[in-house]
Amino acid sequence: MKKLLRALLLASLAALATLARAETLTVSAAASLTDALREIGPQFEAAHPGVEVRFNFGASGLLVQQLRQGAPVDLLLTADLASMDQAASLTLIRPETRIDFAGNVLVLIEAAKTAAPLRQLSDLSQPSVRRIAIGKPASVPAGRYAREVLEAAGLWDALQPKLVPADNVRQALDYVARGEVQAGFVYLSDAATQGDKLRVVQRFNVAVRYPGAVTQA
């Protein structure tokens, strides 16, 4: 999956960059794309002499806010359709350049070594689970997807005291990796960056799609 994501990103970045026609390409991208984009950045520059690429990572909702406030951005890559739809409604992007370039999977994770491993989503109600990392639903797509999953399971209200809000999906990942929480909601691609340190408890059937577009800047 990681190789496919990188290949898709490289191809999409090249296509969008051609449309943007910038010597210094500033890309605002969802936090879950951090590792993939940092890896392909040098490859892109090698294939496009004279073009320097700079990345700005964060929660998709925050990236749209930054763009609305005048941030100098050439390409916008979000982790959900809603954020890109918002950017389009605010005429912040060139709609004819919009493409869906990748997908992902929302997962529930925990530390690989734990005394009482979780087996399923409902186990989050157990007393042993005191803190659960989740992206802020208002600005973090992964958090919004997680809320939908919890609401569908009838767990959202009951788990409120345990939820630890994260500014982006990578912060939620870090909370789990550092042992500051017992579980967290992230994307499968994020969990994969931690090797065998973390364990995927459950995958969820949520349509996670990544759109990209050239901005109007």
Locations of the language-model features?
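Exported/periplasmic ABC-transporter solute-binding proteins
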Residues: A22-H48, E52-F57, G61, Q65-Q69, ...
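Bacterial N-terminal signal peptides
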Residues: A7-A17
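Positively charged n-region of N-terminal signal peptides that target proteins for export
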Residues: M1-R6
